[in-house]
């Protein structure tokens, strides 16, 4: 096992033709109740929108999965989440979503960093999953 096997550092960016405040609201929606899988089915996610707030999947009937906690929320420019996410093994994740007002709209930057005993399949598919999130946010505002 090498250090590369134990770490993940992924960045994705999208420019959205919408006001930064509207983009931030869509980010909160898509990371919470509006979270979907690529096939359109709901993820049943809850995002408590305050520092220390939980970010979790509520499957109903007392079944759920803690994905993380809100580390930083600074509307309309920054959301940081940290925790195990979907990884049910020894790993820690940090998600940083930054928004910058640009000419004609907003630049949304997502950075996902993780370390631990990372599953190779998770590392391979994570870019596709985050692209779905960013595409969904862009679609919300088009």
Question: What are the residue ranges of the model-derived segments?
Answer:
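Tryptophan-centric aromatic hotspots in well-structured domains and transmembrane helices
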Residues: 27, 83, 130-131
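Short acidic N-proximal helix/loop "leader" segments that mark the beginning
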Residues: 1-11
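Short beta-edge strand/loop motif at the mouth of beta-sheet-based domains
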Residues: 11-12, 18, 29-66, 76
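Short, well-ordered beta-strand elements
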Residues: 108-112
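A conserved amphipathic terminal alpha-helix motif
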Residues: 114-142
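Hydrophobic-ligand binding "helix-grip"
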Residues: 45-46, 56, 60-103, 113-116
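Solvent-exposed alpha-helix faces
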Residues: 28-29, 135
